[in-house]
């Protein structure tokens, strides 16, 4: 045990990952979480590390951006990845979890850690007299949001996240729904709902015309203006700046008749056993729990009114009698103007004792948020030790994300892990095959990351 003491605000993925890592170094951590005294509009559970948008933590292959990120996290000692293994549900080549089991496992690890003291109460003030890590998430509001705004001297930015509905397995029509993964890769962990052309066109028309739920003042900031994309009938609605990775399905439908067919409803790699042919379009369902009694509708984040969700989504083949245990919702996502206010060590340039982690920084995604918590914790601990860590190599996934976060950008938007932010390979070492190229980039990243860890041993 050391004499160091640190405050962490927020027990989401980033806050829990940071608190557990710091506690593992002997630091005494005071972890503050506002639930259950106060819930954000999107959170329902009292547990820590609550997953909202999806139960998928994305791909595990090293030659994928998400898989590479996970490998770098493992090398930093991620406890959330260990918790994810406990809560794993089958999802082909992806790491998906039972949300409740995952949250319970993370909560257990935090509450049983002797170096972490949990305070179930909101915080309204940031004390700069000692290092503090703010990981309060994308729905930070109230006096704490005002405090952050005062520290950064910047109007907070915002965009919108949307959540997909969940249906019961027993309510599905298995004469139409079939189990398969694309191209037969891995186990048949997804259920598929195949459309023919006429069914799809009717569904698209109904979806494009469906009535959306009004956004609350906490979401819109009480601002009203025209939506950037008119719906199929040319009507306008409230403007929202939507993160592409959580795009509401109705906004996608408004972009064109085939947009969904080349997005979440793409039929490639699938054959409908009832016809022997590839469907015109296809909706996938992914298990929400280990028992596979619940499924979420993949890619169907939405802000439709609940009655409209039931009416329109029951037009999906196999979901005609679907029982919805959760409807989709839409909520605001608040984040810093990171390039202007954050250093490469994830602390405020003007207030170096104040560190930030998670989605509030502009890291977008579950695992990205957790990775950010690990990185911020390492930098904070180095500060306690009187050191400053050198920047992460830009050819690592974590390094590329931090570089994106802290590089000047007049139209800064959150970013998740993707191979496109890694620097290209030298021409003479650049395979033409994309999968081989990604593997070469991943192997380079792992080597660079391990070297950085060795050189900055904490």
Question: Model-found features: residue ranges?
Answer:
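Beta1/beta-strand and adjacent pyrophosphate-binding region of the FAD-binding site
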Residues: 2-14
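Helical element adjacent to the flavin cofactor pocket in flavoenzyme catalytic cores
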Residues: 99-118
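Predominantly flavin-linked oxidoreductase catalytic cores and closely associated redox partners
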Residues: 112-286, 291, 295-306, 310-311
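A glycine-rich dinucleotide-binding beta-alpha-beta segment and adjacent secondary-structure elements
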Residues: 297-363, 370-372, 390-407, 412-418, ...
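C-terminal auxiliary extensions adjacent to catalytic cores
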Residues: 412-458
């Amino acid at each position: 045990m050391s004499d160091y003491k640190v405050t962490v605000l927020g027990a989401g993925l980033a806050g829990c990952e940071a608190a557990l890592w710091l506690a593992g170094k002997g630091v005494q951590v005071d972890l503050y979480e506002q639930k259950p005294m106060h819930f954000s509009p999107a959170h329902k559970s009292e547990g820590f590390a609550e997953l909202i948008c999806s139960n998928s933590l994305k791909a595990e292959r090293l030659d994928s951006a998400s898989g590479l990120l996970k490998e770098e996290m493992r090398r930093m000692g991620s406890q959330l990845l260990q918790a994810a293994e406990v809560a794993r549900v089958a999802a082909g080549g992806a790491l998906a979890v039972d949300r409740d089991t995952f949250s319970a496992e993370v909560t257990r690890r935090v509450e049983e850690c002797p170096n972490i003291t949990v305070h179930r109460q909101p915080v309204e003030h940031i004390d700069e007299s000692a290092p503090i890590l703010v990981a309060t998430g994308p729905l930070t509001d109230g006096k704490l949001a005002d405090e952050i705004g005062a520290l950064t001297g910047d109007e907070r930015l915002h965009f919108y996240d949307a959540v997909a509905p969940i249906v019961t397995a027993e309510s599905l029509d298995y004469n139409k729904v079939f189990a398969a993964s694309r191209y037969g890769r891995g186990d048949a962990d997804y259920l598929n709902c195949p459309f023919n052309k006429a069914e799809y066109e009717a569904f698209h028309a109904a979806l494009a015309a469906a009535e959306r739920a009004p956004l609350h003042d906490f979401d819109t900031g009480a601002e009203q203006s025209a939506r950037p994309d008119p719906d199929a009938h040319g009507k306008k609605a409230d403007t929202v700046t939507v993160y592409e990775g959580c795009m509401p399905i109705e906004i996608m439908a408004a972009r064109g008749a085939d947009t969904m067919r080349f997005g979440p409803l793409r039929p490639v790699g699938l054959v409908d056993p009832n016809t022997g042919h590839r469907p015109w379009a296809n909706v996938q369902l992914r298990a929400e729990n280990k028992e596979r009694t619940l499924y979420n509708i993949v890619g169907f984040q939405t802000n439709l009114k609940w009655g409209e969700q039931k009416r329109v989504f029951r037009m999906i083949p196999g979901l005609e009698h679907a029982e919805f245990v959760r409807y989709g919702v839409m909520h605001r996502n608040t984040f810093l103007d990171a390039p202007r206010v954050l250093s490469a060590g994830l602390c405020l340039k003007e207030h170096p004792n104040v560190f930030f982690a998670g989605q509030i920084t502009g890291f977008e995604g579950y695992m990205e948020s957790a990775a950010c918590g690990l990185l911020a914790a390492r930098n904070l601990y180095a500060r306690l030790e009187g050191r400053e860590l050198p920047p992460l190599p830009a050819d690592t996934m974590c390094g590329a994300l931090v570089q994106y976060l802290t590089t000047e950008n007049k139209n800064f938007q959150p970013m998740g892990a993707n191979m496109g932010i890694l620097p290209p390979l030298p021409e003479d070492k650049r395979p033409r095959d994309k999968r081989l190229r990604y593997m070469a980039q991943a192997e380079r990243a792992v080597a660079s990351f391990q070297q950085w860890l060795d050189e900055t041993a904490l």
